[in-house]
Amino acid sequence: MSVMAAMGGAQVLSSTGAFADPAPDAVAQQWAIFRAKYLRPSGRVVDTGNGGESHSEGQGYGMLFAASAGDLASFQSMWMWARTNLQHTNDKLFSWRFLKGHQPPVPDKNNATDGDLLIALALGRAGKRFQRPDYIQDAMAIYGDVLNLMTMKAGPYVVLMPGAVGFTKKDSVILNLSYYVMPSLLQAFDLTADPRWRQVMEDGIRLVSAGRFGQWRLPPDWLAVNRATGALSIASGWPPRFSYDAIRVPLYFYWAHMLAPNVLADFTRFWNNFGANALPGWVDLTTGARSPYNAPPGYLAVAECTGLDSAGELPTLDHAPDYYSAALTLLVYIARAEETIK
């Protein structure tokens, strides 16, 4: 699917108000469960699967969910918490992690670009939904710094770096394709009309198409791009898996109507080889080995919207084992609601 086709879809959604009011009752109901389980009164979203830490990703997800459900009070509390505790003073990006009880609570000032893009996506949508132009200006400021600070050339690609520090090697750059939050990149182009966003999206589509490995032709959690030639390989230093991070790739590209038919076909083949009752939590892209445990409900929700034949109703957040599985599930609820509206 071309970027221009996806952009046209995004502009239709924006102009018809679907971005401004995408929440049927199901989304609002699931948000209420997420809010009760993972949002603290301070506005801090808690990652229960990682020792109760918080991060820019979680704040972005929470803000996006609240905007989708029309919950302005919760949105404001999460945005204020993120600005106060995570946003940099020298740019508009966000430190990636907050550790309650530690001194300092933000020991690492490095950003996580997906968190930045999720917060900007939430701000842009909240600005439209709640008629708050200041939120849209905040989103545009974040997008400007992501574009200027987090993109670079690697071979034939303009790539989106995962963070400011730690991902540039002598001969390669390390990417996380799940950090390409495609609905946010579409919104960035829609708000700014900067053609550089089009290049980032087009190259993101190319990277997802070319950067797939193993018998199932799946993207790895971490991908290396040769800085001179653009050759792609599974990054060393991480398990060579399709797992915790890469599970978001089909979701984000489906949501933005950018999931190419051949890529969708490979995901569909993978999901249905195992089925809903035996889908692995990870698969090794070099050996084909699978996790000894099955995928949590959030992974099944992603599979359900990208080709799993045996799926039934979407899981509810009542049964989510932790924050991340719940977040994936609620993202699917929102993506499906917007598909229905479109």
From Swiss-Prot:
Report which reactions are catalysed by this protein: Endohydrolysis of (1->4)-beta-D-glucosidic linkages in cellulose, lichenin and cereal beta-D-glucans
Q: What is the lineage of its organism?
A: Bacteria, Pseudomonadati, Pseudomonadota, Alphaproteobacteria, Acetobacterales
**InterPro entries from the xrefs?**
6-hairpin_glycosidase_sf, 6hp_glycosidase-like_sf, Glyco_hydro_8, Glyco_hydro_8_CS
Which Pfam families does the annotation name?
Glyco_hydro_8
Q: What is its EC number?
A: 3.2.1.4
Name the top EC class: hydrolase
Give the organism the record lists. Novacetimonas hansenii
* Active-site residues from the entry: 57, 114
Q: Which GO terms describe its biological process?
A: cellulose catabolic process
Localization, per the record, is: Secreted
Q: Gene3D superfamilies from the xrefs?
A: 1.50.10.10
Keywords recorded for this protein, A-Z:
Carbohydrate metabolism, Cellulose degradation, Glycosidase, Hydrolase, Polysaccharide degradation, Secreted, Signal
Q: Where is the signal peptide?
A: 1-20
UniProt GO cellular component terms: extracellular region
In Swiss-Prot or TrEMBL terms, this protein is called: Probable endoglucanase
